[in-house]
């Protein structure tokens, strides 16, 4: 996936579609899986809550 695919334009503002990794910081996005978010760079993982 290219970096430009991770942003969209809304009302003349650039909006991120994905969250940044809290460990790696801005510029490194978390991959969204069915049950978790994960960072491919550092291995950080957050599991989604089941409601």
Swiss-Prot record:
Zn(2+) binds at residues 21, 24, 39, 42. Keywords: Metal-binding, Ribonucleoprotein, Ribosomal protein, Zinc, Zinc-finger. GO terms for biological process: translation. Gene3D superfamilies: 6.20.50.180. The keyword Plastid does not apply. Binds 1 zinc ion per subunit. The keyword Ribonucleoprotein applies. This is Small ribosomal subunit protein eS31. The gene is rps27ae.
């Amino acid at each position: 996936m290219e970096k430009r695919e991770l942003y969209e334009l809304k009302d003349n503002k650039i909006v991120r579609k994905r969250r940044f990794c809290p460990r790696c910081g801005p510029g490194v996005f978390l991959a969204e899986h069915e049950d978790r978010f994960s960072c491919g760079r550092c291995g950080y993982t957050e599991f989604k809550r089941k409601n």
